[in-house]
């Protein structure tokens, strides 16, 4: 039975889900889902659409199921500078503010003072 591995790559302008499996000792890759991405203004801040990104990942997982290629593992790669805070129940607290938001303007100069 073939083992499939899923990579979720979310970038600043697009995201994609790639399935991989070994064939004759080599990794074979297949893009199963691609979507546009970008920040939107929310409450005066530039934010990632967290809920929509989650839906896109689920859509990619559904596509894997439709193809009959269920991954045995999954890895997610996103930006190294953004984060969300979660409460005890795993719910997002506040907006998912992005690194390009105005709130960080001038901070690089402050670091070197």
Kindly label every feature range from the protein language model.
Residues 1-95, 105-106:
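N-terminal glycine/serine-rich phosphate-binding loop of ATP-dependent small-molecule kinases
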Residues 100-113:
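Glycine-rich phosphate-binding loop plus the immediately following alpha-helix
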């Amino acid at each position: 039975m073939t083992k499939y591995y899923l990579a979720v790559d979310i970038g600043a302008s697009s995201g994609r889900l790639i399935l991989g499996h070994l064939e004759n000792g080599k990794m074979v890759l297949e893009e199963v889902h691609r979507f546009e991405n970008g920040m939107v203004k929310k409450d005066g801040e530039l934010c990632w659409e967290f809920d929509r990104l989650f839906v896109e990942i689920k859509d990619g997982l559904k596509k894997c199921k439709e193809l009959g290629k269920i991954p045995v593992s999954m890895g997610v790669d996103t930006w190294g500078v953004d984060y969300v805070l979660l409460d005890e129940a795993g719910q997002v607290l506040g907006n998912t503010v992005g690194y390009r938001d105005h709130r960080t303007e001038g901070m690089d100069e402050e670091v070197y003072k």
